[in-house]
Protein backbone atom coordinates (compact mmCIF):
# COMPACT_ATOMS: atom_id res chain seq x y z
CA UNK A 1 0.00 0.00 0.00
CA UNK A 2 1.49 3.41 -1.00
CA UNK A 3 2.32 5.90 1.74
CA UNK A 4 -0.26 8.60 2.33
CA UNK A 5 0.71 12.10 1.29
CA UNK A 6 1.14 14.54 4.14
CA UNK A 7 -0.42 17.97 3.83
CA UNK A 8 -2.33 19.40 0.90
CA UNK A 9 -1.35 18.61 -2.66
CA UNK A 10 0.81 21.34 -4.20
CA UNK A 11 -0.82 24.01 -6.32
CA UNK A 12 -0.96 22.74 -9.87
CA UNK A 13 -1.66 19.18 -8.73
CA UNK A 14 -5.25 19.72 -7.66
CA UNK A 15 -5.81 23.40 -8.41
CA UNK A 16 -4.32 25.92 -10.84
CA UNK A 17 -1.94 28.75 -10.09
CA UNK A 18 -3.84 32.05 -10.25
CA UNK A 19 -2.34 34.80 -12.40
CA UNK A 20 -3.99 38.19 -12.81
CA UNK A 21 -3.27 40.51 -15.74
CA UNK A 22 -4.26 44.16 -15.68
CA UNK A 23 -4.12 46.59 -18.56
CA UNK A 24 -2.01 49.66 -17.78
CA UNK A 25 -3.56 52.13 -20.22
CA UNK A 26 -0.99 54.84 -19.51
CA UNK A 27 1.99 52.58 -20.23
CA UNK A 28 0.04 50.68 -22.92
CA UNK A 29 1.04 47.26 -21.55
CA UNK A 30 -0.52 44.26 -19.83
CA UNK A 31 1.01 43.51 -16.41
CA UNK A 32 0.77 40.04 -14.81
CA UNK A 33 1.24 39.26 -11.11
CA UNK A 34 0.43 36.31 -8.87
CA UNK A 35 0.25 35.49 -5.17
CA UNK A 36 0.76 31.81 -6.12
CA UNK A 37 3.97 32.30 -8.13
CA UNK A 38 6.60 34.08 -5.99
CA UNK A 39 8.30 36.95 -7.79
CA UNK A 40 6.02 36.97 -10.81
CA UNK A 41 5.79 40.37 -12.44
CA UNK A 42 5.71 40.44 -16.23
CA UNK A 43 4.54 42.89 -18.84
CA UNK A 44 3.90 42.82 -22.57
CA UNK A 45 2.14 44.89 -25.21
CA UNK A 46 -0.53 42.25 -25.89
CA UNK A 47 -2.19 39.44 -23.94
CA UNK A 48 -0.83 36.94 -26.47
CA UNK A 49 2.75 38.14 -25.89
CA UNK A 50 2.18 38.06 -22.14
CA UNK A 51 0.92 34.47 -22.25
CA UNK A 52 3.91 33.44 -24.37
CA UNK A 53 6.26 35.01 -21.81
CA UNK A 54 4.44 33.39 -18.87
CA UNK A 55 4.84 29.92 -20.39
CA UNK A 56 8.58 30.17 -19.77
CA UNK A 57 8.65 32.51 -16.76
CA UNK A 58 6.28 30.56 -14.49
CA UNK A 59 8.15 27.20 -14.56
CA UNK A 60 11.45 29.04 -14.02
CA UNK A 61 10.13 30.97 -11.01
CA UNK A 62 8.59 27.86 -9.46
CA UNK A 63 11.91 26.05 -9.75
CA UNK A 64 13.97 29.01 -8.48
CA UNK A 65 11.68 29.39 -5.46
CA UNK A 66 11.51 25.63 -4.77
CA UNK A 67 7.72 25.66 -5.06
CA UNK A 68 6.45 22.07 -5.29
CA UNK A 69 4.43 21.39 -8.43
CA UNK A 70 3.53 18.59 -10.79
CA UNK A 71 4.93 18.13 -14.29
CA UNK A 72 1.80 19.76 -15.68
CA UNK A 73 1.40 23.36 -14.50
CA UNK A 74 -2.13 24.69 -14.81
CA UNK A 75 -2.75 28.42 -14.72
CA UNK A 76 -6.01 30.28 -14.15
CA UNK A 77 -5.29 33.43 -16.17
CA UNK A 78 -7.62 36.33 -15.35
CA UNK A 79 -7.36 39.50 -17.45
CA UNK A 80 -8.95 42.81 -16.47
CA UNK A 81 -9.19 46.06 -18.34
CA UNK A 82 -10.94 49.27 -17.37
CA UNK A 83 -12.56 51.02 -20.30
CA UNK A 84 -14.02 54.53 -20.13
CA UNK A 85 -17.23 54.86 -22.13
CA UNK A 86 -18.53 58.28 -23.03
CA UNK A 87 -22.32 58.47 -23.41
CA UNK A 88 -23.62 59.81 -26.70
CA UNK A 89 -24.71 63.43 -26.57
Regions found by a protein language model. Give the residues of each.
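Short, charged, surface-exposed hinge/linker loops at domain edges
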Residues: 1-22, 48-89
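A general structural-boundary detector
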Residues: 8, 37-38
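Short aromatic-glycine-(Arg/Gly/Cys) micro-motifs in beta-strand/loop hairpins
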Residues: 22-37
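A short, exposed loop/beta-hairpin motif centered on an aromatic-Gly-Thr core
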Residues: 38-49
